[in-house]
Amino acid sequence: MKMKTSNIIFSIVIVLLITVLMTGRSTIGSLLSGNVHFPEEYVNNVLTMEDGQRFTVFRRLMVDGNKEGQGTPAIFKVRFRFKNFNIGVNKRLSIIPAPFLIGMEGFLEKDWTINEATNEFQGIYQWSSTEAAEKYPNSFIFELMTKRAAPGTVTYEIMPNTDLSAYLSAISNK
């Protein structure tokens, strides 16, 4: 198992390096300019979703000044179960796509959440427009995530004209 884990982690690091090279200029520019933040607001808050499931926010990422393709904001939500590793390992590995997200046109924010009762992970993203949100399921990083998900567990939805801050405030149980 240790060899398998190290092979997977090595593969992920290679993919990360390729991704940074692909999105390098905008990612590095955002990082160096101080536009990338990991705010604590909502971290450890429990969110009660529309289907009644409860997810806890364990990480947030925000990018200022990434408003290309502006329109009305949209939320992209994805939910799935990982097929390998325990919750702790997957929480740590879940940061790997961050450099790619930072470089994506229209990406503004991601909240990582988990339902520990069902072992489901959920990502809640803010995009600058519905068009930007609609591109995400066709991205390399989304494809990588779905390959790590247990078969048949990936679901997603796009919520046009929705501001993530207002949405989180409405569903947060603190």
Language model segments and positions:
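Short S/T/G/P-rich N-terminal loop/turn motif that feeds into the first structured element of a domain
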Residues: K4-L108, M159-K174
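Short, well-ordered beta-strand segments in beta-rich or mixed alpha/beta enzyme
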Residues: V20, A74-F80, E109-F140
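Generic marker of residues within folded, mature protein domains
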Residues: E68, F100, T113-I114, T146-R148
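Conserved short hydrophobic interaction patches
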Residues: F100, M104, S139-L144
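Exported/periplasmic cell-wall-interacting domains
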Residues: E134, M145-T146
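Conserved short beta-strand edge segments in small beta-sheet-based binding/regulatory domains
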Residues: T146-P160
